[in-house]
Amino acid sequence: MKRFLLSRRQRHLRMICFHNISLFRANGDSKLIKEYGDGFIPCFFILESIRGELLYVSEVQSGSLRKLSFQELPKLTGASTMIVLKLVGLVPSDILCTISSDKNGIIDDKWCVLCTYTIDLNKLQPINEDTVLITGTNAPVLDLIDGSYTLAAEKIKPLKGLVSSHKRNISQVKIKFSLAYSSLLKLNKLLEYSSQVHEEINEISSKIEDDFLSLKNQNHWYMRTVQKSIETLEKEVLQRKKSKKNIEMAQLESNDTINHSKTELSLMSQDESINDDYGSIYSRFVQIKDRLDQLRFKKLYQLIGIFHSTDLFNSDRGYIYFEKPSSVNDVINRLKLKPLNIEILLRQAGESTKHREYVNSQLGYYLLFLHLTAIQIFKAPLPYRLMYYGSTSVIDSQYPLYFTDQMISKHQAKLIKAIHYFNADILQFKQILENYRPT
């Protein structure tokens, strides 16, 4: 019994047949068609996905009556409604020598693609091969589980019967249509099952939305905490700059009030006072820089404490190694940033959907930590711009630093570039920390 399909897909394909196989077009050279058109042509077909992925290559067959049936088609598992079908035939060397300018260079038969079809399985016309005649050249007929189909553009003609069928009078008996109780019972069960499925889908959707909102709120809390720390750091740095500017203005005013003597003794004393002032200003600058360094180390230590709630500093799965320092001044020497390994990340993300979401969130936290530490705290430029968007962060506005459920080749190439650029930023910042010289 044929099944009714809402949508025909690759997995419903059972057999492929080609009608009117020919090496020549219908409007080709009539002389060649007459001479070589009636021979047996060895053929096979190639089945590909719409993305160019190879699905199946058939065996070579030579059919009779210009018709080939490939019945040993394996069971496909694809869910796509589009396929690419190619028919490949063996062209004899005699034909190649006839149409080629190089007569001596062709000695063997050649395999050539006779036709290529991009087929939408839901846009085919149903046919019955026993009652219609297909007139097109190399016309495919696809046998699916719900019937036989050919291309919508193919021309078909109904076959005329050799013997006219016997005509008889139509019975006048009225048929009364009825519906059995068992059919109604089955329909009721189907409706109950459908309603249960819809209820379960709604419950699962609501749970997913609740989990997503809770995770989103948690990320917002981290962002607010980090933003408050950044604002506090900027205010303290601004106050330090103002105090430094006031010291400079006071020194300039004190220098303007010095009485210039015309004697050599007064000039010597003036030089000595200038040297003393220079020494005092330099020492104050050193003190201010030392306070600024202390402030940076303190903010870095606070930032590390904030990110300790994530797994960035986990000894097994984390990306940052940090050993508790003996003093705040030693915090940058205890901080070690690890570069990303694309092979390890691909293996972890491919285990399950939960592992992929975990890896994406950790990559987002790592990017945010590097951005805040380098740009906000140490004011150090990085070669590539880091943009934090949670578990879908990007680099330079175009390279995604996250994994998807379907890793197409284009996304994977951009992801590899993003990891390369991110490792370059890590290397740049590690060199800055190694060359950083606090007072």
Curated annotation (Swiss-Prot):
Family membership: Belongs to the VPS38 family.
Disulfide bridge positions per record: none
Gene Ontology biological-process entries: cellular response to potassium ion starvation; late endosome to vacuole transport; macroautophagy; phosphatidylinositol phosphate biosynthetic process; protein transport; SNARE complex assembly
Assembly information from the UniProt record: Component of the VPS34 PI3-kinase complex II composed of VPS15, VPS30, VPS34 and VPS38.
Membrane topology designation: Peripheral membrane protein
Chief place where the protein resides: Golgi
Function: Involved in endosome-to-Golgi retrograde transport as part of the VPS34 PI3-kinase complex II. This complex is required for the endosome-to-Golgi retrieval of PEP1 and KEX2, and the recruitment of VPS5 and VPS7, two components of the retromer complex, to endosomal membranes (probably through generating a specific pool of phosphatidylinositol 3-phosphate allowing the recruitment of the retromer complex proteins to the endosome). Mediates the interaction between VPS30 and the VPS34-VPS15 core complex, leading to the recruitment of VPS30 to the membrane.
MF-aspect GO terms: SNARE binding
A GO term from the CC aspect: endosome membrane
Location of this chain's protein in the cell: Golgi apparatus, trans-Golgi network membrane; Endosome membrane
Coiled-coil zones: 223-255
Domain of life, per lineage: Eukaryota
Pfam families attached to this UniProt entry: VPS38
UniProt protein name: Vacuolar protein sorting-associated protein 38
Remaining remarks: Present with 1070 molecules/cell in log phase SD medium.
Disrupted gene: phenotype observed: Abnormal reticulophagy.
UniProt keyword annotations, A-Z: Coiled coil, Endosome, Golgi apparatus, Membrane, Protein transport, Transport
